[in-house]
Swiss-Prot record:
Binding site for Mg(2+) 1: 217, 221
Membership in a protein family: Belongs to the ketol-acid reductoisomerase family.
Domain KARI C-terminal knotted residues, every copy: 209-344, 345-486
Annotated residues for binding of Mg(2+) 2: 217, 389, 393
Taxonomy of the source species: Bacteria, Pseudomonadati, Pseudomonadota, Gammaproteobacteria, Alteromonadales
Entry keywords, A to Z: Amino-acid biosynthesis, Branched-chain amino acid biosynthesis, Magnesium, Metal-binding, NADP, Oxidoreductase, Repeat
Native organism: Shewanella amazonensis (strain ATCC BAA-1098 / SB2B)
Pathway stated in the Swiss-Prot or TrEMBL entry: Amino-acid biosynthesis; L-isoleucine biosynthesis; L-isoleucine from 2-oxobutanoate: step 2/4; Amino-acid biosynthesis; L-valine biosynthesis; L-valine from pyruvate: step 2/4
Protein's name in the database: Ketol-acid reductoisomerase (NADP(+))
Keyword tRNA-binding attached: no
Pfam family, one: KARI_N
Gene Ontology molecular function: ketol-acid reductoisomerase activity; magnesium ion binding
Reported cofactor(s): Mg(2+)
Gene Ontology cellular-component terms listed: cytosol
Length: 493
C-alpha cells in the first residue's frame, strides 16, 4: 500500500488539507434517522467502542459487537464489557455479513489487519467507518469500491463522550467522507446521523477530510498535546528538585498544576489563562513564551514537515514491523524518569498557587499552543482543525497526567500519539535543558518575591494586546461561543 496523501497532486493535497467547516445545527434536524433500522456492528470494545455504542443504543440504534473468536472463547475484557452492558456479541463471520454499517474502533496499528479481514465479509454497498484516518491516508488502504468510507471522530476520550451524552449534551466531533469511496453520494448523510447518535451534534460538528484530520491530529498530539506536557514535567521537576524544592511537592505542583492551568485555558483560551497571573508574572510568562517559541519553532516545523511528507509514518510503521522495539524502549525509559518516580504529597496546594508558582508551565503551554496552531495553519490546515488539535484538547491530556502522571497519559493516548510524543520529547529536552536550568527559581516552585502588582502601564497594554490579538484566540473565542450556544439550545429542548 502506498501513502494516499503522497499520491495526490499539490492542488488536491491543499484542497483536502484546507477542508473544514463548522456545521450549522439545522443540518442535523433529522438526528440519526438516516441510519435507524440499520444493523450497526462495532469492532473494538475499548473506551471509544463501548461508550459510543452505549450512546448510539440510547439514541435508538441497533448495535452489536464483533470480536475475534478467541476473545469470545476466552471471555476477554472486550467480551465482558460488551456482554455486561447487554449487547449482542458475535464473531466477525457471524455479524459482519449482515452489517449495514461497520465501525472500526480498534487501535491504529491493527487497522490494516482488521480491515483486510472484514472487507471480504462485508455485503455489497455497506459502509465502513473510522475514528482516525491514519489507515486510509498514511497506509494507503484501498477499500472495495462499492463500500462507503466515512470518519466520525469525537474530540474527547471515550469516557467523556458518554458522560456528556448522559448530561444531555455531547462532545465536539469531526466527520469526513473518503472521496475515493462514496459510491452512492450519501456518505455525508451517514456520517451526520452517526455523529448525532453519539451526541456530537449538540456540541458542534466539523465537516473535514480524512487528510486534514490525520495531519492535524498527528501534529497536535506530538507537540502541544503530549510532547510539550511531557517535556514540561520532566524538565520542570528536575529544576525544582535542583533548587531544593521537596520532591513530593515539586511533583504535585506539576502533576496537578498542568490540569489546573489548562482548565483556565479551556474556559477562556490563552487570554484567560494569562489573566490568572499577577501583572508582573503575566509579563514574565509572556516574555518566556516568546523565548521558548524562538528555541522550539524549528522543531515544530520539522515535525510538521515529517508529518506532511509521510516520513513520520514511515519510521513509525517500521517500528511496528520491528515489534515496537523503539516504542517499548522509550516507554520504559519514560517510566524511569525522576518525575515518574517522585513521592506523592498530601500537602494542600491552593488553586491560585499553581499559577503563582507555575509561571514556567504557563509559558510552556502558551508557547506550545501558539506554535502548534501557527505551524499547522502555515502548512495549509484550516484554523478550525488547528484549534481543535491544539488548544481544545490540551486540558484533556493534562487531566490524564493529573491522574497517574506520564504513565497514564501514554496509556490513554493512541499508539501513534505515544510514538510521536517520544520523538518530540527526545529532541525538546536537550534543546531546553540549559534554558530551564538557568532560569530563576521564582518562575517554577518559588513564585515572584516582589508582592507588588505594579508594572509599567504601557508595557502591560502591549502584552495584553499581543496575547489577545492572535489567530488562535480569535477562532477559539468563535468556536467556544458555538459550543456554548449549542449547549443552551440542548438544555432548552
Amino acid at each position: 500500500m502506498a501513502n494516499y496523501f503522497n499520491s495526490l497532486n499539490l492542488r488536491q493535497q491543499l484542497a483536502q488539507l484546507s477542508q473544514c467547516r463548522f456545521m450549522d445545527r439545522s443540518e442535523f434536524e433529522n438526528g440519526c434517522d438516516y441510519i435507524k433500522g440499520w444493523n450497526i456492528v462495532i469492532l473494538g470494545c475499548g473506551a471509544q467502542g463501548l461508550n459510543q455504542g452505549l450512546n448510539m443504543r440510547d439514541s435508538g440504534l441497533n448495535i452489536s459487537y464483533a470480536l475475534r473468536a478467541e476473545a469470545i472463547a476466552e471471555k476477554r475484557a472486550s467480551w465482558k464489557k460488551a456482554t455486561d452492558n447487554g449487547f449482542t456479541v458475535g464473531t466477525f463471520e457471524e455479524l459482519i455479513p449482515q452489517a449495514d454499517l461497520v465501525l472500526n474502533l480498534t487501535p491504529d496499528k491493527q487497522h490494516s489487519n482488521v480491515v483486510n479481514t472484514v472487507m471480504p465479509l462485508m455485503k455489497q454497498g455497506a459502509t465502513l467507518s473510522y475514528s482516525h484516518g491514519f489507515n486510509i491516508v498514511e497506509e494507503g488502504m484501498q477499500v472495495r469500491p462499492d463500500i462507503t468510507v466515512i470518519m466520525v471522530a469525537p474530540k474527547c476520550p471515550g469516557t467523556e463522550v458518554r458522560e456528556e451524552y448522559k448530561r444531555g449534551f455531547g462532545v465536539p466531533t469531526l466527520i469526513a467522507v473518503h472521496p475515493e469511496n462514496d459510491p452512492r453520494g450519501d456518505g455525508l448523510e451517514i456520517a451526520k446521523a452517526y455523529a448525532s447518535a453519539t451526541g456530537g451534534d449538540r456540541a458542534g460538528v466539523l465537516h473535514s477530510s480524512f487528510i486534514a484530520e490525520v495531519k492535524s491530529d498527528l501534529m497536535g498530539e506530538q507537540t502541544i498535546l503530549c510532547g510539550m506536557l511531557q517535556t514540561s514535567a520532566i524538565l520542570g521537576y528536575e529544576k525544582m528538585v535542583a533548587d531544593g524544592v521537596e520532591p513530593g511537592y515539586a511533583a504535585k505542583l506539576i502533576q496537578q498544576g498542568l490540569e489546573t492551568i489548562t482548565e483556565a485555558l479551556k474556559q477562556g483560551g490563552i487570554t484567560n489563562m494569562m489573566d490568572r497571573l499577577s501583572n508582573p508574572a503575566k509579563i514574565k510568562a509572556f516574555d518566556m513564551a516568546e523565548e521558548l517559541k524562538g528555541i522550539l519553532a524549528p522543531l515544530f516545523e520539522k515535525h510538521m514537515d515529517d508529518i506532511i511528507s509521510g516520513e513520520f509514518s514511515r519510521t513509525m510503521m517500521a517500528d511496528w514491523a520491528n515489534d515496537d522495539a523503539n516504542l517499548l524502549r522509550w516507554r520504559a525509559e519514560t517510566n524511569e524518569t525522576a518525575f515518574e518516580n517522585a513521592p506523592s504529597s498530601n500537602e494542600h496546594i491552593d488553586e491560585q498557587t499553581y499559577f503563582d508558582k507555575g509561571i514556567f508551565l504557563v509559558a510552556m503551554i502558551k508557547a506550545g499552543v501558539e506554535l502548534a496552531f501557527d505551524t499547522m495553519v502555515d502548512a495549509g490546515i484550516i484554523e478550525e482543525s488547528a484549534y481543535y488539535e491544539s488548544l481544545h484538547e490540551t486540558p484533556l491530556i493534562a487531566n490524564t497526567i493529573a491522574r497517574k502522571r506520564l504513565y497514564e497519559m501514554n496509556v490513554v493516548i493512541s499508539d501513534t500519539a505515544e510514538y510521536g510524543c517520544y520523538l518530540f520529547n527526545h529532541a525538546a529536552v536537550p534543546l531546553l535543558r540549559d534554558y530551564v536550568k538557568s532560569m530563576s527559581a521564582e518562575y517554577l516552585g518559588g513564585g515572584l518575591k516582589d508582592s507588588s502588582n505594579a508594572v509599567d502601564n504601557v508595557r502591560l497594554i502591549e502584552v495584553n494586546q499581543a496575547i489577545r490579538n492572535t489567530a488562535v484566540e480569535f477562532i477559539g473565542e468563535e468556536l467556544r461561543g458555538y459550543m456554548k450556544d449549542m449547549k443552551r439550545i440542548s438544555a432548552a429542548q
